[in-house]
Design a protein with these regions (language model features):
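Conserved acyl-donor/pantetheine-binding loop and adjacent beta-alpha core of acyl/acetyltransferases
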Residues: 63-96
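Conserved acetyl-CoA-binding loop of GNAT-fold acetyltransferases
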Residues: 142-152
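Conserved acetyl-CoA-binding loop-helix of GNAT-fold acetyltransferases
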Residues: 104-117, 142-143
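Conserved GNAT acetyl-CoA-binding A-motif
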Residues: 119-132
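A short helix-loop-beta-strand connector motif used in the catalytic cores of GNAT acetyltransferases and
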Residues: 46-60
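Conserved N-terminal entry element of GNAT/NAT acetyltransferase domains
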Residues: 1-12, 163
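A short, internal acetyl-CoA/4′-phosphopantetheine-binding micro-motif in the GNAT/acyltransferase core
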Residues: 93-104, 131
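Conserved GNAT-fold acetyl-CoA-binding loop/helix
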Residues: 25-48
Length: 163
């Protein structure tokens, strides 16, 4: 696998973030969901609809020839319109998606580290996420300093303190 670089996400990355959201939703190839089903599900589309709103931040990983290989971004949600990993107003929730051929190559770690730094620089005290308990990415989140604060069904809500 060749190298990759990480850059800040921009408003024109909306389609790319949507692609990576579909990758994140389909982490388990045995239970893969059709793209249109993921996009029609508000639980997922919530994370990309209207990108880049005030308070949104994120990073994109690109391989050779600037081909996108992954993205990690965060978004603020209101208490009356929460995401899966909502823990409170003012706490951004992140999502991470990496193309399958680039998984286990350091892309997810690089993106996660960059987004955590970005959220910290934006003044956030914490950042949260929601992950299915069987998703191997849960180990990435644990080693990056995220800890479980709630479990519901097959999902865990995790938080990392930024200051």
């Amino acid at each position: 696998m060749e190298g990759f670089r990480v850059r800040d996400a921009v408003p024109s990355d909306a389609r790319l973030l949507t692609d990576m959201m579909v990758e994140a939703a389909n982490w388990n190839w045995r239970q893969s969901r059709p793209r249109m089903a993921v996009l029609a599900d508000r639980d997922f589309s919530h994370y990309v609809s209207g990108w880049q709103k005030p308070g949104d931040g994120g990073c994109v990983a690109e391989g050779d020839e600037d081909s996108p290989v992954g993205a990690c971004w965060y978004r603020l949600f209101a208490a009356n319109d929460p995401g899966h990993g909502f823990v409170g107003p003012g706490v951004p929730e992140l999502i991470l998606g990496v193309s399958p051929v680039w998984r286990a190559q350091g892309v997810g770690r690089a993106l996660l580290d960059a987004v955590v730094a970005q959220a910290r620089a934006a003044g956030h005290a914490r950042i949260s996420l929601s992950v299915e308990r069987d998703n191997y990415a849960i180990n990435l989140y644990r080693t990056a300093g995220f800890f479980r604060i709630a479990s519901t069904g097959s999902r865990e809500t995790m938080v990392r303190t930024l200051r």
